[in-house]
Each structure stands twice: as structure tokens, then as C-alpha cells.
Amino acid sequence: MRIEEDLKLGFKDVLIRPKRSTLKSRSDVELERQFTFKHSGQSWSGVPIIAANMDTVGTFSMASALASFDILTAVHKHYSVEEWQAFINNSSADVLKHVMVSTGTSDADFEKTKQILDLNSALNFVCIDVANGYSEHFVQFVAKAREAWPTKTICAGNVVTGEMCEELILSGADIVKVGIGPGSVCTTRVKTGVGYPQLSAVIECADAAHGLGGMIVSDGGCTTPGDVAKAFGGGADFVMLGGMLAGHEESGGRIVEENGEKFMLFYGMSSESAMKRHVGGVAEYRAAEGKTVKLPLRGPVENTARDILGGLRSACTYVGASRLKELTKRTTFIRVQEQENRIFNNL
């Protein structure tokens, strides 16, 4: 046993210090990034935000809506091959290039993903997703996927430390998904005691990944557009959002009614709700590590997308970054004990 004495920080622990700027307007900021990925060799350009691969966020409807903003969607793994075929038949190549095909690590997952990728060559992203990316089995699956799909861009996670980030990149991942426990409907930290404050995880993993020519996506912990800006400021190449995109018309959650008001259910993918829906219940050897919440209906996701992108542009203007790519170079974090004036929050 040992204790690391240095302080680890989450998004709520910091603010971005403003700096002199030559930008005249938020409209001068370029949010689109262009990437060429280490292993696949593929190039992609767009806004590097990803809708999370949760079945109440990462839906086909969400992918279609967010593609118009050049935002990616990691489509959840519970759609059938037939449902994928129907979606592809009704979607343009421009939508498909903003889609990630999500998979687990079982043999059945591998075969199903292979069938989906064979449906259309425009599907260039694979998201290999497990709660604990530290297992040897997971690393071996990433290597197997890289061998099977040498020209596909592979995103794999989740991890929170530099050495595991490096191992996944060396095993074939182009993008490493970073985050254990920060999600809005994740209870891993309270059920297991395991986790890592998200901003510090992003900073550590970005440093490790960029040294090898890899990239990272910050997954979880964002509650506001300001948090998205902090994730990019900390070095994230991509930011994945779940709760911020939940509760919309495109989110796919079940709608319930209470006292005449309608709500949409949103739950973590390790929650009892998710396991009952997809595997028949919580196995006797494990505990649920997610919760279910009822969200007021939030309308079309386009309004939220515009709010997030607007906040991100504004953050860039405050530090003089004319492009999103420059944000991390222009970011100085200050540690704080307050984020906002909350006097009217309960009104």
C-alpha cells in the first residue's frame, strides 16, 4: 500500500484564467479540427465532441442530428445488424463518417462488429468500450481488433493513468477513452472506491498519449459547456458527453409520466436498469455501478449542441485562441473554491 500525496483535480476545482486576445468576435473561432490517426492512417475533420455510447444517448437519431454539427456519435452496441443495415440505407455518407461503431470484448461482440463494419466502408470508427480498461483481456482484444481492422480508427477505454494509456496505444488504439467514475449516472466511485478526478486524468493521459502520437477522449464529468472547455484546455483531443445530451427527442430513453408531467429515463450502462434490459438482470457476483434518473424532456438536441459550441467558442475568445487546437496552449488553470454565484439557483 502507498499514498500519492500530490493533489488530483476535477473540473469543479479550477477555472481558466483569461488572457489578452486579438479576436473581435466568437464567430472568428474555428472549432473544427483535422486529425490523422496513428495506426489507421485515416484522416477526419470535424468538431471533436462525441455523443456517448449509452443506449439513452448514442442512438441512430442522435447520430443523424449531430452530424449536421460535424459532431461524432458513438452508437451504442445494442442495435442488431439488421437495424444497422436499415440505418445505413437511410443515411448519407456524410452522416456515416460521424459514426462510431461500439463494441464489447466478447467473441460474439467481435463477430457482430465485423458484420456491421462489412455493411458499409464509410464506417471508419470502432469504439471498444469496457468499464475497466486495465485487464489483460482488454489489451489483447484491442490488439486483435487492430489486426482485424488495420484501416479502422480504434477508440478504446476506459483508463485514467498514463502507463495504461501508453499500453493501449502500443496495442493498436488510435484514441484512448479516459475516465473512471466521473459520469452523471455512474456510481463506480462509491460502490468500489476506485476512480480518478477527471481533469488530472485528462492531463496525465494526454501527456502520455501525445508522446506516442496517440490521442485521448475525455469521457465523463462534464456538466456545463465550461467543463467541455476545461477538458480541451487540459489536453483532450476529443470530449465525450452523456448526461449533457440525455433527455432529448433523439436520446431514445423511455418516457414516463408523473403527476401529469413527462420525463425521460436516463441510466448508466452498469446500472440495474441497463442490465435488466440487456442481460436479464444483475448477476449475483456483481453490484450495479450506475443509477437511473428521470429527466424533464429537453426538446431537440440541436438547441443543446448550439449552446455547447457557443460556450466553447466563447472560452476560446477569453484566452485568445482563434482555433480549438490552440486552446490547450493558451490555457492556464487556476485552483478555486467557487465556480458560480448560486443565489438564484433554486428559483
From Swiss-Prot:
InterPro entries tied to this protein: Aldolase_TIM, GMP_reductase, GMPR, IMP_DH/GMP_Rdtase_CS, IMP_DH_GMPRt
Catalytic activities: IMP + NH4(+) + NADP(+) = GMP + NADPH + 2 H(+)
UniProt keyword Metal-binding, yes or no: yes
Keyword line: Metal-binding, NADP, Oxidoreductase, Potassium
Annotated binding of NADP(+), by residue: 108-131, 216-239
SMART domains in the record: IMPDH (SM01240)
Amino acids binding K(+): 181, 183
Residues at the catalytic site: 186 (thioimidate intermediate)
GO cellular component terms, A-Z: cytosol; GMP reductase complex
One GO molecular-function entry: GMP reductase activity
GO biological process, one term: purine nucleotide metabolic process
EC number annotated for this UniProt entry: 1.7.1.7
PANTHER family in the cross-refs: GMP REDUCTASE
Homology family: Belongs to the IMPDH/GMPR family. GuaC type 1 subfamily.
Assembly mode: Homotetramer.
Function of the molecule: Catalyzes the irreversible NADPH-dependent deamination of GMP to IMP. It functions in the conversion of nucleobase, nucleoside and nucleotide derivatives of G to A nucleotides, and in maintaining the intracellular balance of A and G nucleotides.
Protein name in the entry: GMP reductase
